Regions:
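Surface-exposed, secretory/extracytoplasmic low-complexity segments enriched in Ser/Thr/Asn/Gly/Pro
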Residues: 1-203
């Protein structure tokens, strides 16, 4: 028999074969995960996700000569054709914006790293990530996942999908401020009052 993309297509027309492919994509959906929230699902019919015929199946079946159908009943031939899909990108953007992770009340802004005095010395307190989406970048991540037929995507795996802190723990100006603060704590000044001296240090 004739198999195309793992489907037994023996004695089927191109229209019938492509209908099988269409049915295969009818139930498509993608699960979207994000920082700190439960996953949500975007169904294929919400974005007009569908199989798009390229004409490859028809061309493949037309190339087979009538007598090869008889021969094909006794031996298996397997073929692979591309399965192109399409969807409405505007609707995908709308679905993204409707997700819980895109709602302001569910987002926390990132916090900058800063210098703090702890346990007798100055240290850098690292920035926090937050969960505020960068909608443009998040859409690109989601769009690429849908275009490649993935059934799940996690924005947390792509830091660029989120708004990042302006000042990170590796910021050069912050490192310099830390060094200056710790130099201050190590400095000492000695005052002389007649025969008495008093030393003041950063502590």
């Amino acid at each position: 028999g004739t198999w195309i993309n793992g489907v037994n297509c023996s004695q089927m027309t191109a229209y019938e074969v492509e209908n099988l492919f269409r049915q295969k994509f009818q139930d498509y959906s993608i699960e979207v995960s994000s920082r700190g929230l439960d996953p949500q699902t975007i169904a294929g019919d919400q974005i007009d996700y569908q199989y798009l015929s390229t004409g490859e199946v028809l061309k493949l079946l037309q190339q087979q000569k009538p007598y090869e159908w008889i021969k094909g009943m006794y031996e298996q031939k397997s073929y692979t054709v591309s399965e192109n899909t399409g969807y409405n990108k505007t609707k995908l953007q709308e679905q993204l914006k409707s997700l819980n992770c895109a709602q302001a009340e569910n987002q926390t802004a990132p916090e900058n790293a800063y210098v703090a005095f702890q346990d007798g010395q100055f240290v850098i307190v690292p920035e926090t990530e937050g969960s505020k989406l960068n909608i443009k970048q998040a859409y690109q991540v989601l769009d690429a996942a849908v275009e490649s037929g993935q059934t799940s995507v996690n924005f947390a795996d792509t830091p660029e999908a989120y708004v990042s802190a302006d000042v990170t723990q590796n910021d050069q100006a912050l490192q310099s401020a830390l060094e200056a603060c710790n130099n201050y704590t190590r400095a000492s000044i000695t005052y002389t009052f007649g025969d008495r001296t008093e030393t003041l240090d950063g502590n």
